[in-house]
């Protein structure tokens, strides 16, 4: 019994301890657990509600997406139809463009082919014509006939021009009026002075005048001073200077001409040198005429001119003003080799010494034309495919004389490339009646 009571008391103590210390925490824990369960249930309900809402939103989004997809598909179909239409239109336009371009290309190629065929046919025709002409003019009589036909045409030209005197360019026509008047005055002074001189004195005069011109070429300040226009009262100073410089170095005839030249009015200082050079040439030509050698001198001068034209290297060496004049004159003398007479040699040496603004071949041609012009003649430089007869030369000179109103001296060069006819040059004018030029003109006027 006591055991039972003891056990009961122990049980009661245990119950008390459990109720006192175990039950409150358990209750608290259970309350918390219940709150947690309730919260979870609430959250679960909220989640379920959100799930329902999400499912509804998803379904709505699917419906909207289907509607948008249907609209996009309709728009895409419409765009596809429009694009297909545009592509068809573009393709049709491109086909039409290619078709038109192809037709244009066909037309252009046809025209080009026609032009090429015309050009080839024309060129072949000209070539064949050239062959026929060359074959024809191989006969000397036919060659001569081409010259006669040219002379006939030239005669018709002479009839249409009339007898009015035409100006022929000269080597000194580039001077201004004042210089031309002064040069004419110096020529008059020379003629008065030369009237009393013999051949040797004329040569001495030419040498003295050329020496003065050579001095003025090298002494620019002196040339400028002597050629400057001054009042009549100041001319005495020029004359005094000339006397002091040249009085004991040149002869009295040359000194008189130089004194006259420095008191004249010149448009440019170079014109003073040109006038002295002109007088020096006239002195030698006057000697040649008095000695009966003028025609030989003319012929030799023209021959040398043609040699210089044919030998540009020789002309360049003679024209090199930086080389000593003595060396250039020696070169000229070696080239002449004694084949020119004394006057021609002196004229050529003088010309080479005084070169300073023109080439040798031009200066020599000027001297040759001056020799002819002294007799109121002009020179016609004529080219022919073959030598012409004396009768043709005479007729040519007569016809040209009718055209230019003055005597014409004919200088002939042979150039087989002309084929036939003649080419006439007088001064700056050219009359081209050669067959080669006519063939070239025919080739230029071929249809395109």
From Swiss-Prot:
CDD domains: ATP-synt_Fo_b (cd06503). Its main location: membrane. InterPro entries: ATP_synth_B-like_membr_sf (IPR028987), ATP_synth_b/b'su_bac/chlpt (IPR002146), ATP_synth_F0_bsu_bac (IPR005864), ATP_synth_OSCP/delta_N_sf (IPR026015), ATPase_OSCP/d_CS (IPR020781), ATPase_OSCP/dsu (IPR000711). Residues 169-448 are annotated as: ATP synthase subunit delta. Pfam families: ATP-synt_B (PF00430), OSCP (PF00213). It comes from the Bacteria. It is found in: Cell membrane. The keyword Transmembrane applies. GO terms for cellular component: plasma membrane; proton-transporting ATP synthase complex. In the N-terminal section; belongs to the ATPase B chain family. In the C-terminal section; belongs to the ATPase delta chain family. This is ATP synthase subunit b-delta. It comes from Mycobacteroides abscessus (strain ATCC 19977 / DSM 44196 / CCUG 20993 / CIP 104536 / JCM 13569 / NCTC 13031 / TMC 1543 / L948).
